[in-house]
C-alpha cells in the first residue's frame, strides 16, 4: 500500500503542477498506471471551474479560453510540449533524424501549428459543450491512451523518464487502476454508449498511428497521444451532444 501511495504521488508530481510536500516520498517507477486517475483529479477541477464560470454568467468563448489556460497551467504544458516536438519530428522526411529533431528544445513551425490546432479545437469545442462532466471523461481517456501506448509499443530511446515508465510497468496487470476507473465513471458519469466506444477506439488508433510514423514511442509522443486524444474527444463529444 505504501508503494502504491508513493506511485500515486509520483504521478501527481510528474504529470501536474499541483504542490506536493517535499516530506512525502515519491516514486516514478510504476507511476504511469495512475495517469487516468490524475486525469480524474484534473478533470474534476476543470469541471468545478466551469460550473463557477457558468454561475457567474461568463460568456462561453471567454469561459472556454479560461478553462484551456487553466488546463495548461495544471499540467505545465507537459503534454502540449510533447505534441509540438512530435509534430516537428514528423515534419522531417528522414526517419533517422526524427528523434534528433524531437529532442531539440526549440519549437519549429510545425510544432507551433500543431499547438494552435490543438488549442483551437479545445477552445471551440468547450464553448459548445453542454455537459461539463464530459471534461472528466476527456482527461481520463486521454491519459488512458498514454497508458496503452506505454504498454503496447516499444520505447525508442535507451534512457529518459519515458523509459522508466516503460520498463517499470507490468502489463496487462497494471491496467487494473484504469479499468477500475472506467467502470466507476460508467456508473457515476455515464456516457452514451456510442461516445464511449468512440473514445475507446481513439485510444487504440492514435497511439497506433504514431507508432506507424515513428516505429515506436518516446516521452514526446506520449504527450502527443494525450493532447490529440483529448482534442478529438472534445470535438466528438460536442458533435454528439449537438446531434
From Swiss-Prot:
The chain crosses the membrane at residues 8-28, 36-56, 58-78, 107-127, 131-151, 187-207, 222-242. Pfam families: CobS. Its cofactor is Mg(2+). One of its GO terms (biological process) is cobalamin biosynthetic process. It is an enzyme of class 2 (transferase). It is a multi-pass membrane protein. It catalyses: alpha-ribazole + adenosylcob(III)inamide-GDP = adenosylcob(III)alamin + GMP + H(+); alpha-ribazole 5'-phosphate + adenosylcob(III)inamide-GDP = adenosylcob(III)alamin 5'-phosphate + GMP + H(+). PANTHER family: ADENOSYLCOBINAMIDE-GDP RIBAZOLETRANSFERASE. This is Adenosylcobinamide-GDP ribazoletransferase.
